[in-house]
Amino acid sequence: MKKLFVTLCIALFSVGAFAQEKGDMAVGGSLNFNTKASMFGIGARYQYFFIDKLRGDGEFAYYFKKDGVSMFTILASANYLFNVADKINVYPIAGLGIAHSSASSDDYTVSYGGQTVHVSSDGASSTDFIGQIGAGGQYDFSDKVAGNFDAKLQFGHGTAFVLAAGIIYKF
């Protein structure tokens, strides 16, 4: 019985170890939410395994315009995957990138108490270097498709907490 248990444990850990090998790649998309700006966005990502369990993750996220402000981020991160159960990996996130935000120019009229004022503002934009730390989880639906969820703290362009849920295709 002990030999059977040990054999099953080795087989289980081997499945997790072979699921992510050096040279493996994946592409995917995500739905994002930036809590500081209360903005929803979409993301695209590319992942490459440098060595078993250690991957680089390149991500572009575009946040939909809200109150005249739009934003995007481009990030490069590193993740080390820990296999915690069959088909389930968790990983820390550490990365650097840029964040760009822009506010459109608006012309509007404000009326209050019988007074009418015309307000005009020029647009503005900002591009900053940012860092991020966080944690994520991945569930492998099959050998080729996985779902993931990330919770990240981004800093350098103000501090924002970002949640992202997505799906990736491995090849």
Q: What is each of the regions a protein language model found here?
A:
Residues 1-23:
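Cleavable N-terminal export/targeting peptides
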Residues 20-33, 92:
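Transmembrane beta-strand segments of Gram-negative outer membrane beta-barrel proteins
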Residues 26-28, 43, 75-77, 132-134, ...:
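Membrane-embedded beta-strand positions in outer-membrane beta-barrel channels/transporters
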Residues 27-29, 115-120, 148-149:
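Extracytoplasmic loops and strand-loop junctions of Gram-negative outer membrane beta-barrel proteins
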Residues 28-55, 85:
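N-terminal targeting signals for Sec/Tat export/insertion, comprising classic cleavable signal peptides
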Residues 30-42, 63-71, 152-163:
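Solvent-exposed loop/turn segments connecting transmembrane beta-strands
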Residues 47-112, 128, 139-143, 147, ...:
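Gram-negative (and chloroplast) outer-membrane scaffold detector with strong preference
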